[in-house]
Design a protein with these regions (language model features):
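Residue-level marker of positions within ordered structural domains that often coincide
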Residues: 9-10, 54
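Short, surface-exposed loop and linker segments with low hydrophobicity and enrichment for Pro/Ser/Thr
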Residues: 13-21, 59-63, 76-80
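Intrinsically disordered, low-complexity regions
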Residues: 7, 22, 30-33, 60, ...
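N-terminal segment of the mature soluble domain
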Residues: 20-69
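N-terminal signal peptide c-region/cleavage motif recognized by signal peptidases
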Residues: 3-5
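C-terminal/domain-edge helix-coil "capping" segments
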Residues: 10-21, 45, 91-129
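Surface-exposed short loop/turn segments
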Residues: 51-56, 64-110
């Protein structure tokens, strides 16, 4: 079966046997009920994974090869900006990488995509070790 690149779809994993060898990810967020900018960042990261050709988003931590744990707090009264701590941990509990991000609601899409690339590079480095 030949796939035209424009018709290729992102990996989806309701059945992990369909995509053997695909890297599965889960995003777990910890933020307050009113922290809308933090929530928007977590959703943007989940969306970036769902659109990715290299990764598959899963909802069950037991099915995840890596977990992205995001702790965030909105830093202004309008809930337009958030300070976020992102930690990537392997299924074996090994710390892969950690970074801190300031994100505004206006640029969460770009930040989610950029951080997915950052995480991909960190995972590739960890696999070479």
């Amino acid at each position: 079966m030949w796939l035209h690149p424009a018709l290729a779809r992102a990996a989806t994993c309701p059945n992990l046997n369909v995509h053997p060898g695909i890297t599965t990810l889960i995003v777990q967020g910890d933020y307050g009920e009113k922290d809308q900018a933090s929530k928007a960042y977590v959703v943007s990261l989940q969306d970036a994974i769902k659109k990715s050709q290299n990764f598959c988003y899963v909802d069950d931590v037991r099915a995840a090869t890596y977990a992205l744990d995001v702790a965030g707090v909105d830093i202004d009264e309008e809930h337009e900006r958030a300070a976020l701590s992102v930690v990537v941990v392997s299924e074996r509990g090994m710390l892969i990488t950690h970074w801190v991000r300031i994100s505004s609601v206006d640029n969460v899409g770009k930040n989610g995509q950029d951080d997915l690339h950052k995480m991909d590079r960190a995972i590739q480095r960890a696999k070479r070790r």
